[in-house]
Amino acid sequence: MVLEAVLLGIVQGITEFLPISSTAHMYILAKLLNLHVPGRFFLSSVQLGTSFALILYFFKDVKGIISETSRSIYSFIQFGIRQKQEKRNEYTRLGLLLVTGTIPVVLLGFLLVRFVPDGFFSAARNLFTMGVALIVFGLLLGFADALFRRKKGNIFQITFIESVLIGAAQIFAIIPGVSRSGITITTARFLNFDRQLAVRFSFLLSLPVTFIGGMYGLVAGPDTDYYSLGYSLIGAIVSFVVGLLVVSALLRIISKTTFVLFVYYRVLFGLFLVIVSFF
């Protein structure tokens, strides 16, 4: 069981941040190696592990967003003015962009949970659907990355409409194989973000949803999960360490190349899943 928790933690740490779908890989690994398919509590634990990896890697940004946004709100309430420092304005704006980007996916998620039958989500978790999603959204990423070359690399160049569009795009990630980071990076590239800004904004935008979602899964308490609290903790620690390494590596890689390798991988892996689904 320890080995299973470690393997699933490694897969989560690697695939959560790469635009290749963590859900599909966790599911396939469990099937191929005949592991127990992880339940809500374990998945929430490893999700929090990767969330804390992001918080640590972007600690300066997270700290700046929280402190300067709070200070600006307090200043506005007290004096009706904004802070003038350039860095403070950047963090304040980034905080507001993340809020506006989070609101649509929360609202859409609530509507889905409220009105879409539970059977839809379980029915979508099959090899064929995952394979098609990997291929289609992989090609979209490649198209956006190749076609839209205009550089938008500054926080001040991001509009609130763009943050809403990128945030709303996260809802597609409920389809196994889409990839939350993949769809947000793709949308950002369609909006002419350069690769570094697209990845940075995508990762920061994921924090509110993944952190709150992970905490909710833990607060809801252990389900009938095969993995106990101890094994869930092991998975979370492993996903944290691996996730931290992957974030650092990805940001270095995209500063020198395109997303083409991820596109090739998604298409080939997707084709494999589609073919296997017929046997």
From Swiss-Prot:
Q: Which InterPro entries match?
A: UppP
- What Enzyme Commission number(s) appear in the record? 3.6.1.27
Q: Which GO terms describe its biological process?
A: cell wall organization; peptidoglycan biosynthetic process; regulation of cell shape; response to antibiotic
Per the record, the similarity remark reads: Belongs to the UppP family.
Note in the entry: Bacitracin is thought to be involved in the inhibition of peptidoglycan synthesis by sequestering undecaprenyl diphosphate, thereby reducing the pool of lipid carrier available.
Q: What Pfam families does the database record attribute to this sequence?
A: BacA (PF02673)
Catalyses: di-trans,octa-cis-undecaprenyl diphosphate + H2O = di-trans,octa-cis-undecaprenyl phosphate + phosphate + H(+)
- Matching HAMAP family, A to Z? Undec_diphosphatase
Membrane-related topology note: Multi-pass membrane protein
> Which PANTHER family does UniProt cross-reference here?
UNDECAPRENYL-DIPHOSPHATASE (PTHR30622:SF4)
| Transmembrane spans | 1-21, 39-59, 96-116, 128-148, 155-175, 201-221, 231-251, 259-279
**According to the lineage, what is the superkingdom?**
Bacteria
Location (main, coarse): membrane
Task: Please state what the protein is called.
Answer: Undecaprenyl-diphosphatase
What are the record keywords, sorted? Antibiotic resistance, Cell membrane, Cell shape, Cell wall biogenesis/degradation, Hydrolase, Membrane, Peptidoglycan synthesis, Transmembrane, Transmembrane helix
Gene Ontology molecular function, alphabetical:
undecaprenyl-diphosphatase activity
Functional note = Catalyzes the dephosphorylation of undecaprenyl diphosphate (UPP). Confers resistance to bacitracin.
Its Gene Ontology cellular component terms are: plasma membrane
The record's subcellular locations are: Cell membrane
